[in-house]
């Protein structure tokens, strides 16, 4: 099975004065449906990933979960 990954676009997510980069990818596997993925690297070995049926859905999920992810790291 061949998996193809394509960067569609990059967005900035602003939270409490900081900017976080969100990359939106499309993954397509032969003979399977397409999946979209949003990825944000918060630090070394710390990556947040959300998926969706569309790029917009993946981005919306990522924007919803990022504040919680960022705040949870501040507690550590």
Language-model segment annotations:
Residues 26-47:
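Short aromatic-glycine-(Arg/Gly/Cys) micro-motifs in beta-strand/loop hairpins
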Residues 17, 29-30, 56, 60:
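Generic cytosolic/nucleocytoplasmic N-terminal low-complexity/intrinsically disordered segments
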Residues 1-19:
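Negatively charged, low-complexity tracts enriched in Asp/Glu with abundant Ser/Thr
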Residues 43-76:
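Mixed-charge, Lys/Arg-enriched low-complexity segments
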Residues 6-7, 25-27, 44, 73:
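Compositionally biased, intrinsically disordered low-complexity segments
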Residues 13, 25, 38, 55, ...:
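Compositionally biased, intrinsically disordered low-complexity segments enriched
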Residues 21-23:
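Short linear proline/tyrosine/threonine-rich motifs used for host-factor recruitment
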């Amino acid at each position: 099975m061949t998996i193809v990954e394509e960067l569609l676009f990059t967005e900035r997510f602003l939270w409490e004065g900081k900017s976080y980069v969100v990359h939106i990818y499309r993954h397509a596997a032969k003979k399977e449906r397409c999946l979209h993925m949003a990825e944000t690297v918060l630090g070394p070995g710390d990556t947040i990933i959300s998926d969706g049926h569309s790029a917009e859905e993946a981005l919306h999920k990522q924007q919803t979960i990022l504040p919680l992810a960022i705040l949870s790291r501040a507690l550590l």
